[in-house]
From Swiss-Prot:
Keywords: Antibiotic resistance, Disulfide bond, Hydrolase, Plasmid, Signal. GO terms for biological process: beta-lactam antibiotic catabolic process; response to antibiotic. This is Beta-lactamase CARB-6. The lineage of its organism: Bacteria, Pseudomonadati, Pseudomonadota, Gammaproteobacteria, Vibrionales. It catalyses: a beta-lactam + H2O = a substituted beta-amino acid. GO terms for molecular function: beta-lactamase activity. It comes from Vibrio cholerae. Its EC number is 3.5.2.6. The keyword Hydrolase applies.
Amino acid sequence: MKFLLAFSLLIPSVVFASSSKFQQVEQDVKAIEVSLSARIGVSVLDTQNGEYWDYNGNQRFPLTSTFKTIACAKLLYDAEQGKVNPNSTVEIKKADLVTYSPVIEKQVGQAITLDDACFATMTTSDNTAANIILSAVGGPKGVTDFLRQIGDKETRLDRIEPDLNEGKLGDLRDTTTPKAIASTLNQLLFGSTLSEASQKKLESWMVNNQVTGNLLRSVLPVKWSIADRSGAGGFGARSITAIVWSEEKKTIIVSIYLAQTEASMAERNDAIVKIGRSIFEVYTSQSR
């Protein structure tokens, strides 16, 4: 599978969707905000026609594990520039293990390639694997500098796992906006930052995500496909960023962020499902 190339569209050149088209989506999001006493941000970018819609798209939300796509994109970029060898290995030490490392915790005393570390963190959200990648790409600062280089002036990474998931209200560290992350994903997967081979690798890691089956994938329209990366953190943070495309190659970029809620994980997951279903309805109803 190969993504539609999106005509090199970036957020500054998009056309804002009519309010009526996403009226039901907005109503659904607002209702969920009230029911969960949450703060929610959503963005949708149609890469076929540049149409864009958001709800609280410029508000900041905790990145949580959605940063992992950017960190691994930075690794791919650095490899293309000859700055790092993705096949180089790192010894796994017990002292380096952090919370939630389902792959790496079984490999203490062994070595792992950077490429395999990206596969682990992108498909299982392994946090120690993410820290291994961060160490290889210049740490949080290296990721933030990379973001600025490709035109993202909002998204920032300041800490490593697991501290970056703290999620305090008003803390600018380790945050993004729904609008900024959509633009960045568009650039990384469809722009000129990465080679086609690197884009395909990044895409495959997202397609093979093993931890999002109960989120957008559970309400994906028939004959549609998805590549995604989710996250969760303190103070009710829950998030997902996704590239979704139809059999006709119609491709949309979706970002959903929740924060500042006491809702359970199950309730937050259900919120993402409901928002996703509402968004998908906009596009499937057009083809009926």
